[in-house]
């Protein structure tokens, strides 16, 4: 078993997930990547491993919305790599959806992946992170990404807006449970579209914000860090519609 710390990333992908994995790997973390896209997972593993050939990087193909399959995958992560010090939930589906124009089945599938998956991940992580908090020199953290959708939704993204509000609520509940036990629960609030060419809202900046949150000492814990400006993003969206 490696002496390296471990981050588990649920919802890996070529953007934030892989960038976060690569940054943590460069800092000496072993990395577990979970996603249902097998081909993309292989590409993510290569990218993360290049960041540090001396750490272990493993892929776990799983549909995060399948709560039984996810529980089995997380158990395998523990068997392969040991207990996590950081868990990062990044699973999301960004697609148009409107009230009256979207199948309830689609909304249900979104809830399974973005909230039941988050619930399963938090339930699994809970004993591992609280145990880690008992050891000196650790920074056990449960991290997630959110956006202004949680309290300022967009009607064209009705399902995603619903899921983000529920995620925010669930993470506040987790925070209430574990904060006194030494586990940091925190999120990065993304204020717009993530694009490589954006000087602020890009995957590398978000990864850095996540890493910095994970390393905060308890007196300095933040619940939320904002990357970008949601108010400005909404103004831009309104301007585009008016045009």
Language-model features: locations:
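Conserved glycine-rich cofactor-binding loop
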Residues: 13-14
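Conserved glycine-rich Rossmann-like NAD(P)H-binding loop of the short-chain dehydrogenase/reductase
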Residues: 29-43
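Rossmann-fold cofactor-recognition segment
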Residues: 50-68
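Amphipathic alpha-helical dimer-interface segment in Rossmann-like NAD(P)H-dependent oxidoreductases
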Residues: 75, 79, 113-136
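Conserved NAD(P)H cofactor-binding loop of Rossmann-fold oxidoreductase domains
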Residues: 88-96
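Catalytic Tyr-X3-Lys loop
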Residues: 100-120, 167
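Catalytic loop of short-chain dehydrogenase/reductase
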Residues: 110, 130-166, 172, 179, ...
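C-terminal helical subdomain
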Residues: 180-243
């Amino acid at each position: 078993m490696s002496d390296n710390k471990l981050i588990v990333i649920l919802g890996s992908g070529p953007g934030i997930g892989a960038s976060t994995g690569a940054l943590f790997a460069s800092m000496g973390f072993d990395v577990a990547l979970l996603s249902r896209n097998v081909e993309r997972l292989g590409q993510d593993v290569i990218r993360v491993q290049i960041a540090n050939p001396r750490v272990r990087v493993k892929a776990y193909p799983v549909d995060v919305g399948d709560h039984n399959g996810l529980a089995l995958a997380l158990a395998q992560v523990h068997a392969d790599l040991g207990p996590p010090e950081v868990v990062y939930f990044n699973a999301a589906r960004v697609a148009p959806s409107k009230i009256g124009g979207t199948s309830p089945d689609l909304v249900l599938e979104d809830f399974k992946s973005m909230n039941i998956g988050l619930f399963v991940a938090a339930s699994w992580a809970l004993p591992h992170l609280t145990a880690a908090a008992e050891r000196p020199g650790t920074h056990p953290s449960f991290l997630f990404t959110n956006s202004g959708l949680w309290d300022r939704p967009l009607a064209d993204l009705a399902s995603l807006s619903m899921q983000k509000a529920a995620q925010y609520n669930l993470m506040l509940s987790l925070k209430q449970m574990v904060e006194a036990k030494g586990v940091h629960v925190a999120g990065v609030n993304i204020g717009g579209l993530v694009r490589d060419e954006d000087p602020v809202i890009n995957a590398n900046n978000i990864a850095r914000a996540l890493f910095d949150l994970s390393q905060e000492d308890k007196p300095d814990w933040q619940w939320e860090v904002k990357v970008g400006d949601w108010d400005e993003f909404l103004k831009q969206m309104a301007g585009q519609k008016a045009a």
